[in-house]
Amino acid sequence: AVSYACRVFYHFAFFGPVPTFLLMALVTVTAFALAIRMDAQVVAVLGMLGGFLTPVMLSTGEDNPLGLFGYITLLDLGLIAVVRRKRWDYLIGLAMVGTVVLQIGWWGKFFVAENIVIAQRVFLGMPLPFIGAFAWAVRRDWLNRWVTVAAIIPPLVALGVSFALLFTGDLAARPGALFTVVFGADLLLLALVVLKPSLRWLESVGGGLVFALLSLWTLGKLSGDLLSWAFGLYITFALLHTVFPAVLRYLRPAEVAPTPLWSQFFPALSLFLILLP
């Protein structure tokens, strides 16, 4: 708060954007270290709030996704380290919420269709620290609802944003760029199922959302010159969700129940999509 006041209200010469940002980041790191040393959860929460508010309060109004999300990634990794050390599991859920809010904020303020590659990295890259924490938790037997929810929500957000991307600029005419986000998020959900087969319901959720996106694109945006893309996407969808149950049984033979009937619907849905054009 003092650093912010020195820059915004008092306009001290030293407190330019970069020095103020670095100082506030240092305060956040120090707060995490003190929280661990003093076993003080309040300090950790305050440090986290300061960390996520730093890029908001010091925004220059210019788009800098590398700086923003590089910083947020480091902040998330720091919070995950604190959670792993002290088992303050709710912090990882709060970190996920802060990350998603900043993702949506960036998308709402700065995203244009020409930045789709950046959006791919933002919405497919930012879930990785939480999925990594989920994998570590499964391996070390400290998995809990906070870690699980923090890993599940970001890929679902990516799929949710994909519905908006479908109607943004000319992205519907660039299915390769658009459906990279869609299938990438679907793969992240399937990765969680591989790590924890009891989350198999995510396969149907992800597949259902991908089918909905493919259907909307087919009915509202598909043109004759995109037919080859359409058939390629349908086949990719069918193969992914047809092969996955077999892959899961191979990787987790002792933990996977017989293949549920609903998983056989995806090939049929793909055939339905082929009939739509």
Annotate each predicted stretch with a short phrase.
Residues 1-277:
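Extended, compositionally biased regions that are outside compact catalytic cores
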